[in-house]
């Protein structure tokens, strides 16, 4: 027993974290897997949410480490987005702790339903489709320029360079005002509850045409990471974190997000998206 929990229970939480980290990397919905797992153990909603916020930090760490190439040269935008995430996370966490717990229990089902709907509408899939079209067009232009013989002689090089053929992220000065409003609201939402927040941020950035998919996804990860870090600090200071569960979840989330990239190249993201939507629907009904 560790702080009242059996080793088996903590292993189950860690395994749920692996799934949450994996799904979080694939569709930005870690909490739709991890939060229900904590509720299933009988953890009160507010404590479950606080512990979950600390736990899914593992997903953020893994995602940020894996997105270093995508964030290269985007330091100013990355710093601003992390700052927005940090401020929004603090506001969301204080909002959660300042309101009556019954308010949280009342609004959770609609929030989960909204998150599930956002995933079902698949903004990431649309971004991937647009990115694939842009890649194909750029690939054709390059092949025409270099000649078909060079393309055939260096197929491995072509494949390795393929992910890097993208347009650049738009300058900050060209961002519409509603992008900043949307990102800020998503950051507050991430600190308050956060399930599906990554998908909502992705939807905002995708709609604004901020940049190619791989860069948008990296920026989305930064916003959520910043919000979760600051919200976690608030929850820790207030003493509402169940540490054994949070640590087990964090370890699992890191592992899941770390192994996700090579696997998601082979498994359709639609499968993970469907799993997240089903989890969200089940929790909403419950």
Stretches with model-predicted labels:
Residues 40, 45, 84-90, 115, ...:
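Small-residue-rich segments of transmembrane alpha-helices in multi-pass membrane proteins
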Residues 37, 47-53, 204, 215-218, ...:
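Residue-level recognition of specific faces of alpha-helices
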Residues 51-110, 114-115, 228-279:
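Selective hydrophobic functional segments
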Residues 1-44, 132-217:
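Selected transmembrane alpha-helices and immediately adjacent juxtamembrane segments
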Residues 43-52, 75-80, 210-221:
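Membrane-interface alpha-helices at helix entry/exit sites of multi-pass transporters
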Residues 18, 22-26, 61, 117, ...:
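Hydrophobic/aromatic residues within the transmembrane alpha-helices of Major Facilitator Superfamily
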Residues 61-72, 110-151, 155-168, 282-286:
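Transmembrane helix exit motif
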Residues 2-6, 10, 14, 49, ...:
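Hydrophobic, aromatic-rich alpha-helical transmembrane segments
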């Amino acid at each position: 027993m560790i702080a009242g929990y059996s080793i088996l229970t903590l292993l189950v939480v860690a395994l749920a974290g692996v799934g949450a980290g994996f799904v979080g990397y694939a569709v930005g919905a870690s909490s739709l897997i991890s939060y229900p797992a904590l509720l299933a153990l009988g953890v009160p909603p507010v404590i479950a949410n606080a512990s979950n916020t600390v736990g899914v930090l593992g997903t953020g760490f893994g995602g940020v480490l894996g997105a270093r190439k995508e964030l290269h040269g985007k330091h100013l935008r990355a710093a601003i987005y992390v700052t927005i995430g940090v401020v929004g996370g603090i506001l969301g966490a204080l909002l959660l702790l300042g309101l009556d717990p019954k308010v949280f229990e009342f609004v959770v089902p609609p929030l989960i339903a909204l998150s599930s709907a956002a995933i079902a509408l698949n903004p990431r899939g649309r971004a991937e489709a647009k990115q694939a079209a842009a890649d194909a067009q750029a690939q054709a232009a390059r092949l025409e320029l270099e000649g078909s013989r060079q393309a055939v002689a260096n197929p491995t090089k072509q494949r390795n360079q393929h992910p890097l053929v993208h347009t650049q992220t738009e300058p900050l000065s060209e961002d519409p005002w509603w992008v900043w409003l949307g990102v800020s609201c998503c950051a507050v939402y991430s600190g308050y509850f956060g399930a599906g927040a990554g998908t909502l941020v992705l939807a905002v950035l995708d709609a604004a045409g901020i940049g190619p998919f791989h860069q948008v996804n990296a920026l989305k990860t930064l916003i959520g990471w910043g919000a979760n870090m600051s919200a976690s600090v608030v929850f820790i200071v207030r003493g509402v974190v169940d540490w054994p569960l949070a640590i087990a979840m964090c370890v699992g989330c890191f592992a899941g997000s770390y192994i996700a990239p090579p696997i998601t190249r082979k498994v359709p993201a639609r499968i993970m998206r469907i799993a997240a939507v089903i989890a969200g629907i089940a929790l909403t009904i419950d």
